[in-house]
Amino acid sequence: MYIMSKKCYDTSEKIDREQECVEVNYQHRNFESILEIFSVLFIPFLCNSGKKFLQISNASFFLPACFYLLGSSSIIQLYEPLLWLSSFPFCILYVGFGENSVLYHEMYTVCLYNALLSLTQRWKWLSIVLDGLGNSSVNLKLHETVILAFLEITQNSFTFIEGILICTGLTGLCFATFSYEVSPVVSVLSGVLLISLPTLILLNLCILKLAAKLHLSALFTTCLIYFFSALLVFLVSRSWVAGQLGQAPEVWLFNQIFSHRNSLTRIKIIIWWIICLGCFIFILLRSNRNNPLGKYFTTEDEVLNFRRKTYHALVVFLFLPVCCLDPHFLHLSFSGVLFIFLFVEGIRILRLKPFGKMIHEFLWEYTDNRDHKGPLIISHIYLLIGCAIPIWLSNALKGPVASVELLVGVLCLGCGDSMASIIGKRFGKHRISKTNKSIEGVFAFSISVFLVLHLTQAFHVCPSVTFWKTLFMSLCTAILEGVSTENDNLILPMYMWVLYQALD
């Protein structure tokens, strides 16, 4: 356990030293951080008036506010990991799913564990307590194992907070998969993240070490990796998913598309995606050839930002019109595409011929400083996960039910984040001191989400939501986007989803 605490500490320290964003002076309290704490700790619970949150057992989740408002200058900085690794997951669990959810007690202990893990960044002796907790609980031991494996695989690609937050979600997926009977689409998702990915990584590492020891040629090593990866996916992952589904995955997938009662709708969705992707590729090729962006943007940073946000716009066209048509199919599609993205990223990292170098050169043109910290290029994966999280969470809570909450990922990232970034960088004059984002960008985020959400209701894309509820969700999420230094693609969709559950 001490090894894990030290690894987490070293990871967070190294990433914080290399971080390029505006540094926050924790010696002095600022209004932006207070607003961030209030947004996460209080707004969802105040909106969720039917819950009795203020209990002694939940007092630990108010530690971020206590540390920031009452603590000395040496411990003020602990508020952020406590807020995002313990209080925020608990907010999702308590407000989003409720005390009667099947995984409540397991995930409750994980939230407490994350709080202690955050405190070990300041007080190393708490690792002894973590060690005792990990050895006394199978659930916490699983969470510890997930964290160790994730940090080892990803190196410095994620910040400490991002890494532990993702591990918390993976641990919840493990609990749901191995402790309870899950739906077929969850079986596919667990097969992707818990079976295929770890085994592929271990296999490829073994092949690379063997090739280096035996001095095998690069071409032969590449062939070995492709062959054994395909064999492993076919034997291990396919067997797992087949056991969960009760039939061959390819047969099940064919039936889901062509023999389901919603087959016509699903075929239309696939055709729509093909049309959108075809048009996007055509526009992308033309723009690369003619380079028209220099006429409208004055710096390379603005051009890069606009090019990155075109993929956010693509997400809007791909998913916004179809999210509520067939939530079950969207859940399945996101799970499949996530596996493809991760598999392609593996090819890029290993530079496997003939596609590895080509993929790397293409993706590298769209990277920023966050993609340069470790071996992974994560921006496009983050975008996909951010759009998928509300659909995954809603499916776990209610099943495949058409609802506005399915759209919040696309709204936050495709509309809000894109407009906030483009407007803020181009026209922003009034800067927020903590994050260097602009107030103009915050307003652009809120207005764009609000207007697009009302347009979707006007065109009957999704069920209706009251005017004040829409305004409140868009404004609160925009404020959090403006004052938080955490990754927008990860936290904003989950936060807006929680607000919807609190107001529902």
UniProtKB/Swiss-Prot annotation:
**What membrane topology does this protein have?**
Multi-pass membrane protein
Would I find Transcription regulation among this entry's keywords? no
- Assigned EC number: 2.7.1.108
Q: Which domain of life is it from?
A: Eukaryota
Under the cellular component aspect of Gene Ontology, which terms does the record hold? endoplasmic reticulum; endoplasmic reticulum membrane
For this UniProt record, the keywords arranged alphabetically read as follows: Endoplasmic reticulum, Kinase, Membrane, Transferase, Transmembrane, Transmembrane helix
Pathway participation: Protein modification; protein glycosylation
This protein's major location comes to endoplasmic reticulum
Gene Ontology terms: biological process: dolichol phosphate mannose biosynthetic process; dolichyl monophosphate biosynthetic process; protein glycosylation
Q: Which reaction does it catalyse?
A: a di-trans,poly-cis-dolichol + CTP = a di-trans,poly-cis-dolichyl phosphate + CDP + H(+)
GO MF annotations for this entry?
dolichol kinase activity
Please verify whether the record's keywords include Metal-binding.
no
Stretches in topological domain Cytoplasmic: 1-55, 99-157, 209-215, 285-325, 395-403, 462
Return the broad EC class: transferase
Q: Which residues lie on this side of the membrane: Lumenal?
A: 77, 179-187, 237-263, 348-373, 425-440, 484-504
Where does the chain cross the membrane? 56-76, 78-98, 158-178, 188-208, 216-236, 264-284, 326-347, 374-394, 404-424, 441-461, 463-483
Indicate where this protein resides in the cell: Endoplasmic reticulum membrane
* Family (UniProt): Belongs to the polyprenol kinase family.
Function description: Catalyzes CTP-mediated phosphorylation of dolichol, the terminal step in de novo dolichyl monophosphate (Dol-P) biosynthesis. Dol-P is a lipid carrier essential for the synthesis of N-linked and O-linked oligosaccharides and for GPI anchors.
Q: This protein is called what?
A: Dolichol kinase sec59
Q: Which organism is it from?
A: Schizosaccharomyces pombe (strain 972 / ATCC 24843)
Species lineage: Eukaryota, Fungi, Dikarya, Ascomycota, Taphrinomycotina
**Gene assigned in the entry:** sec59
